[in-house]
Design a protein with these regions (language model features):
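Structured surface interface patches that mediate subunit assembly and partner/cofactor docking
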Residues: 1-13, 66-76, 116-225
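Conserved alpha-helical segments that form or flank metal/cofactor-binding pockets of metalloenzymes
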Residues: 51-80
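Helix-loop segments that flank and shape redox-cofactor active sites
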Residues: 25-46, 116-131
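Hydrophobic packing residues in well-ordered alpha-helices of helical domains and bundles
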Residues: 14-17, 96-103, 139
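Aromatic- and histidine-enriched alpha-helix N-cap/loop-to-helix transition segments
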Residues: 19, 42-45, 49-56, 141-144
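Basic, Lys/Arg-rich alpha-helical nucleic-acid-recognition elements, primarily the DNA-binding modules
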Residues: 1-42
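Structural signal for well-ordered, non-membrane alpha-helices
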Residues: 21-25, 29, 58-62, 104-115, ...
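A short, structured beta-strand-centered segment in the mid-to-C-terminal lobe
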Residues: 83-106
Length: 225
């Protein structure tokens, strides 16, 4: 896989990610134990499950950065998907205070690994899906995870409820790329957005591409798995 390191793009993404990390921490200040046990917008997951995943996904990206700095290519999660699922289940029942503390720890651990990366930017990693990814692309993947899963919490009282809670900066950055990815899935590498999607606002349009917005009579975009 060719390296896709572009310093200017990476700088913008890392800055946006840091801002989204801080927004998440600020919004979670009012999290309660009762909220942790509520169902999230993801079927079968509580708010606690989503928070555990945000934490562990951050830890997995940190591991990749540290390994890449040593010239190593590792799996995103030790033990693969089964260990990832078990770890989320094991952490989901933590208290609100414990969740917030661990989210904060994972954020600063990851940001430290990103800040100290040198040659690691030119490495690759095996993602949990089995795909090989460039380390330089991981901050955007993490940014997407933070924004999308913050909306998946479904906590309107905290401002964490669906695509409309995603930051404008994130939507502006990721929408063009995800739109291009959708178009590339069509015959001859061209597949235009359906008319029902083109009439949506930017956040809702990106939400459809990422499987977070449903449109009656229209199948999912199919980009996320």
């Amino acid at each position: 896989m060719g390296n896709t390191f572009d310093a200017a793009v990476v700088n913008r993404v890392v800055e946006g990610l840091a801002q989204s990390h801080q927004k998440l921490l600020l919004d979670l200040e009012a999290l309660t134990d009762e909220m942790v046990r509520l169902p999230s917008l993801l079927e079968g997951w509580t708010v606690g499950h989503v928070l555990a995943h945000i934490t562990q996904q951050g830890d997995s990206i940190r591991r990749i950065f540290l390994a890449a700095e040593q010239g190593q290519i590792i799996d995103q999660y030790e033990g693969g998907m089964s260990e990832r699922v078990a770890a989320i289940e094991g952490a989901a029942l933590r208290s609100a205070k414990e969740h917030v503390a661990d989210v904060r720890r994972s954020i600063y651990d990851l940001e430290g690994a990103i800040a100290s990366a040198r040659q690691g930017w030119f490495g690759t990693a095996r993602m949990v899906s089995g795909a090989i990814a460039s380390v330089a692309d991981l901050p955007l993947r993490r940014w997407r995870e933070v924004e999308v899963h913050q909306g998946d919490l479904g906590l309107s009282e905290l401002g964490c409820d669906g695509p409309e809670s995603w930051s404008l900066n994130y939507v502006r950055h990721d929408l063009p790329g995800m739109t291009m990815q959708f178009k590339a899935h069509g015959p001859m590498g061209f597949n235009d957005l359906p008319s029902q999607v083109r009439t949506l606002g930017p956040a809702q349009r990106l939400g459809w591409l990422l499987g977070r917005v449903s449109i009656e009579g229209l199948p999912p975009a199919g980009l996320m798995g």
